[in-house]
């Protein structure tokens, strides 16, 4: 709730600063040293109002572009979240299937590997205690 209150105040402060800058800039262009003296003149006051209106229009345009960009980004992030949820669900299903198909020895071996931090063996099937087969020598062809 506090964030909602701060944003309009910050926006109003920004508008005030832009107006003050535009008045200072206008007075420097017109060659006056005191902006308040220039504001008393009705023609200059009208130009200041016109500048203020242009500033507000520009700020509204920036705000609408930012809101559009934020909405687009939110949609992209929602889609990514949906894809990640689907992938997570698929991986959980695969994990459950592997748990049901694995033997108790394989599960125990896997738990031991997790506790020691060693990577799972990929060169041999889990549960096998045989050392990996020696690679075939060149020129002998594939062996079964």
From Swiss-Prot:
Gene Ontology biological process terms in this record: negative regulation of apoptotic process; negative regulation of hematopoietic stem cell proliferation; positive regulation of apoptotic process; positive regulation of cell population proliferation; positive regulation of programmed cell death; positive regulation of transforming growth factor beta receptor signaling pathway; regulation of transcription by RNA polymerase II
UniProt-annotated stretches for the region Disordered: 109-144
Keywords: Cytoplasm, Mitochondrion, Nucleus, Repressor, Transcription, Transcription regulation
Disulfide pattern: none
Keyword Membrane: no
Subcellular location: Cytoplasm; Nucleus; Mitochondrion
Domain of life: Eukaryota
Region listing for Leucine-zipper, in residue ranges: 77-98
Purpose: Transcriptional repressor. Plays a role in the repression of hematopoietic precursor cell growth. Promotes IL2 deprivation-induced apoptosis in T-lymphocytes, via repression of TSC22D3/GILZ transcription and activation of the caspase cascade. Positively regulates cell death in response to TGFB3 during mammary gland involution.
Subunit structure: Forms homodimers. Forms a heterodimer with TSC22D4/THG1. Interacts with histone H1-2. Interacts with GNL3.
Keyword RNA-binding: no
Pfam families to which the protein is assigned, alphabetical: TSC22
Gene3D superfamilies: Single helix bin
CDD domains with a match to the protein in the record: ZIP_TSC22D1
GO CC terms: cytoplasm; cytosol; mitochondrion; nucleus; plasma membrane
Entry similarity comment: Belongs to the TSC-22/Dip/Bun family.
Listed name of the protein: TSC22 domain family protein 1
InterPro entries found in the cross-reference section: TSC22/Bun, TSC22/BUN_CS
């Amino acid at each position: 709730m506090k964030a909602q209150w701060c944003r309009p105040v910050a926006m109003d402060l920004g508008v005030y600063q832009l107006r003050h800058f535009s008045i200072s800039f206008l007075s420097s262009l017109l060659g006056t040293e005191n902006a308040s003296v220039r504001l008393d003149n009705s023609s200059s006051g009208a130009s200041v109002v016109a500048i203020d209106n242009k500033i507000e229009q520009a700020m509204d345009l920036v705000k609408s572009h930012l809101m559009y960009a934020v909405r687009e980004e939110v949609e992209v992030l929602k889609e990514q979240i949906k894809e990640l949820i689907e992938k997570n669900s698929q991986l959980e299903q695969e994990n459950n299937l592997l748990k049901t198909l694995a033997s108790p020895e394989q599960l125990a071996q896997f738990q031991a590997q997790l506790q020691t931090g060693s990577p799972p063996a990929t060169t041999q099937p889990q549960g096998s205690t045989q050392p990996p087969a020696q690679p075939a020598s060149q020129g002998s062809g594939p062996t079964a």
